[in-house]
Amino acid sequence: MRFLITAIICSLCAGCASTPKQAVTSIEIKEIKPRYFETEQFKRISEYMTGKEHVGERLILRTQPEHRAGYYFILVLDEDVRRLPIGTIVVGEFYTPKSLGKQTHEFTLPSLRASTDEIHIGLTGEDWPKIGGVPAAWRFTIKDANGAVLGEKQSYLWSL
C-alpha cells in the first residue's frame, strides 16, 4: 500500500513538473482557402436556444464582428493556433472590388483559442458588401506581439 501511495505521489509530481510546449517562433501557412459564407452557415442548434454564437473548435476573426456574412479566408497552418505566442497579430491586406486601393486589417488572436490549425479571417459587413465577386489579390502576415514576422503567404497576383 505504501508503494502505491508513493507511486501516485511521484506521478503527480512528475505531471506537475512537466513544462508546456513552447510558443513557436515561425509558422508556415500551408494553404489559404477563400470562400463566401452566408450568416446561416455559422448558425448551430445551440444558438437557437441560447441566442449566442457557438463557434465550436473554430477560430473566427471578422472585420466587423457583429456581421457574419462575408468573404472569408481560411488560413491552414502547420501548427495548432494555441502554440502561437500571446499577442499574435494576423495582418490581412486585400485588393477588393470595393475600392481601388489596398485594404489592410489587423486581427489580434484571442488569448483563449480552440485547438485547431485553421484561422477563419472574414471581410464582413461594409468591408464586403457584395455577395458575388472575389478579391483580386491578398497577403497574410502573422506577427508576434513585438512585430516579428512568424509566417506569411500571398496570392499569385500579389507579387505582380
Located regions from the model:
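Sec-dependent bacterial lipoprotein signal peptides
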Residues: 1-16
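Bacterial Sec signal peptide processing site at the extreme N-terminus
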Residues: 14-32
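Contiguous beta-strand segments within globular domains
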Residues: 45-80, 84-85, 118-125
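Mid-length scaffold segments of soluble, non-membrane domains
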Residues: 69-111
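A short, structured loop/turn motif at beta-sheet edges
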Residues: 98, 110-116, 144-148
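Short, solvent-exposed, Trp/other aromatic-anchored flexible loops in extracytoplasmic proteins
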Residues: 110-135
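Internal, hydrophobic beta-strand segments that form the core of beta-sheet-rich folds
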Residues: 134-149
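Short beta-strand elements
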Residues: 148-160
